[in-house]
């Protein structure tokens, strides 16, 4: 009996000791090397890099082709509009939005208005990519699984753009109202003024994107007529771009591509012939002479028509040795001094803004001289590629800012199309609105002679979020490549 009594006391003592120890269990068992919270300074650069890489990869694989900047001579499904799932933008936007949401929550809790503003700008740009690519997408319910929203509704594109414009305005107003440095920023290195310029420049882009659906003149004028309150890009120094490194693992995405994969992509005849007609010095930056003439005294440039079948594309003009490849600045020379200055990740540039303002001024939506904006855009594009604008360039009939309003708008759109070469998906997004230049689907296209205007929704959405997916399709139109989204209707 005494033995049992002693054992019972021992058990009780052990229980008491265990209970006492558990009071500090969380503190004792917290790994100091595994943080439970990640700072905005660590989250921000990863968001920026991942989004830039996604956009540049999608542009290389599909965006440059559909806008007829490049063409393919092998594995030509993309060029013939045989598009399957294209989920890069979708996945990257919604994956990274979780971290953007964390930055928003942390910045609000800590009174960090600069970080909040940057997060709102990133959110706005990211959702603009998603809705520009697919149309209606989850927006107000996105990244709300922790709050119990496992089946987010698809917001209308109109509501998304209203939200984007509101967030960009809020961001512009917030920037500079707190003192914290924007540590971790790999786009503007924490420059608050440049972030403010980006917010307002993106507002101009967004307003012009929806300008066929409502009168945007008052909103545009409120920005352009008040530079002290709403500054915009003033030069190429303000370009919202990501500069890659010369060393791994942060090199330009194509620098480490297999040479065979890189060389499947060739100059599009549409763009190359245009550059040759204009004797445009950007041509040898964008493209290389044919391999057969590359090292000769008389280099020859030849582009491939878009939309050829595999046999015709590979054999065009006598074969790959007689077809121009993409410039080395986007491949092996991407880590050179010149390559680092040109082969970047793109959000928006000063040249694009000037072309948007030229269009707006020509249409009477803003004050200012359309010709000046137009020529600023052309000059900025040449300057970005470290080139001087040819002295007679603005005297060329195809370039000179003269003619009817329709002819002037054609020239604005045409030069913007050239300037947006491999600058993300913007050339395609913008072309769908303007129709400039007048592109023709390739002879062997598989899309009923129509150039696609959107991506299909990811198949997983039909399986996991079927009701929301169906509501979006019923509202927007069939889930195919040709259904026009709200601002295109």
Regions found by a protein language model. Name each.
Residues 1-30:
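Bacterial Sec-dependent N-terminal signal peptides
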